Amino acid sequence: MSKFIMIFASMSGNTEEMADIIIEGITEISDVNIEKIDIMEGPEASILGEYDCILLGAYTWGDGELPDDFLDFYEEMDHINLTGKKAAVFGSCDSSYSQYGAAVDILTEKLREQGADIVLEGLKVELNPDDEDIKNCQNFGRDFIKKSLVSSI
C-alpha cells in the first residue's frame, strides 16, 4: 500500500485547518494512513524519500515568501530525489499582499524540480476556510487520493 505524508506550516491555524479538512476528504474514500507532521517538529526533508505520496502545506509570509520555519526543509529538498512520488501543495493566503499564495507556488516548483509528479494544481484559500473552501479542501483530498492511487497502479 502507498505511504502518505503531509508536512505543513501554520502560524494562525488556517493552514492546519486546511490540512485536517484535506485529510477528512482523503479518509472518506480510502483507509490509507497519513502521517501528519507540523514543520515546527523539525522533520528533515530526507523523510520524503520514505513515502510514495507527499502533501505540503504552507502559508505565504510577507510579500511572497516561505515561512521561516520551512526554509531549512526547503533547502534540504535540493538533495532529495523525488522521482516517482505523487505530490501536491496547499496553503492559506492573504490577498492584501501582491503575491497571492506564493509559498504554494514555491513549494510546487521545488517538488517538480526534484522529480515529483504534481498530480493536482496547488490549492489556495483566502485566510481561513469558509464553507466553499471547506468543500474545496475535501475535494482536494479526494482528488489527491484518486490521482495518487490510480497513477501508481
Protein language model annotation of sequence segments:
Residues 2-4, 14-17, 25-30, 35-37, ...:
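FMN-binding flavodoxin-like domain, especially the glycine-rich phosphate-binding loop
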Residues 8-12:
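Aromatic-flanked redox-active Cys/Sec active sites in thiol-based oxidoreductases
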Residues 39-41:
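Conserved SAM/SAH-binding loop
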Residues 43-45:
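Short hydrophobic/charged patches on amphipathic alpha-helices used for structural packing
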